[in-house]
A protein has these predicted regions:
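Jelly-roll (double-stranded beta-helix
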Residues: 1-180
Length: 180
């Protein structure tokens, strides 16, 4: 299954902790957990705590807005534009330094069942059987579909084929899911 997505058409739902909102791109089910893996885009409006997800690995990438800090016990990470950062879902983190609304891209995987690799690329990619491609800038040929910023595709149990830049300024956020 290969599905095109656009930010403007994704439904908005509250965060697990009620402190913000998210737009789910895809949620692949698991027989014994709420999901096997999940991709979403969250709105960053205020400093505050992250939702706790025990047994889940997360990767966050700032898509828009000013850099901010993610803080917790012995953790002080600067989250900057288009730089993926992986962390354990049970870490008690909070965001600090949000001065204007922003967006972040989130990938969550059940730690014992799947793993995610998230990269920003500017060249041709040939992804595996599960993942998400999100256009950061420029235009891309994502399999059979052309996409621009704030859009992309996800795929599950089927490769989309080649992901290729169509403009010289093209940047793509590519997530590859590997089942364990």
């Amino acid at each position: 299954m290969i599905v095109p997505v656009q930010l403007s058409t994704l439904p908005v739902t509250p965060w697990k902790n009620g402190a913000g909102e998210t737009r789910e791109i895809v949620c692949v089910p698991s027989p014994d957990a709420p999901f096997l893996w999940r991709a979403s885009i969250a709105t960053l409006q205020n400093d505050g705590p992250f939702s706790c997800f025990p047994g889940v690995d997360r990767v966050i990438t700032l898509l828009a807005g000013q850099p901010l800090r993610l803080k917790g016990e012995a953790i002080d990470h600067a989250l900057t534009l288009w730089q993926p950062w992986a962390f354990a879902g049970e870490w008690p983190l909070r965001s600090e330094g949000i001065r204007e609304p922003g967006l972040d891209f989130n990938i969550m995987t059940q730690r014992n069942r799947a793993a995610a690799e998230v990269r920003v690329v500017d060249d041709i990619q040939t992804p595996g059987d599960e993942g998400v491609a999100w256009v950061l800038q420029g235009r891309w040929q994502l399999g059979e579909r052309q996409c621009e910023a704030q859009s992309g595709i996800f795929w599950h149990q089927q490769t989309p084929g080649e992901l290729a830049p169509l403009t010289t300024d093209a940047l793509l956020l590519v997530t590859t899911i590997v089942r364990r």
